[in-house]
Amino acid sequence: MLLSAVGDALGYRNEQWEYCESGEQIHSELEGLGGLGNIHVCLPHWPVSDDTVLHLASAQALNTGKDGDALLHEFAAQYVEAMKDMKGRKPGPTSILGTSQLRPGEPLGFQIPFNPKGVGCGAAMRSMCIGLRYPRPEQLPHLVRVSIDSGRMTHNHPTGYLG
């Protein structure tokens, strides 16, 4: 997870590279910074993006040891709390909408309505740690279920939560 966060901070570059579609431009700017070996990933110039903040929220939910609906309520609570740490970050509109609809603690408060536009990759960006909780082959059904259910909390469209 640490290396994921470092890679995210590098790729994000304080909002400058997140949406840059030109690899040549990024490589040129990286060279202008003295190359990768001269980069010191630290605040304030190299923050992590919203993806890492939400990935950490996923890990915190999983770390509670809860299962079933209790775990899903924990995911919802962690995502809602994580959205309070978005200053200087660019969460996507699907993540913003989805988390605004979560009601952790309320019956089925971890479910949001289907979103025909919820096709981004945010759900995938924060789900890597789920495999750490369910690493064994016999746990595969749990891994898939928790991955889908946590993804649907913001990206409730098959393209979004299966991304």
Language model segments and positions:
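Structured, active/binding-site neighborhoods that engage oxygen-rich ligands
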Residues: M1-G163
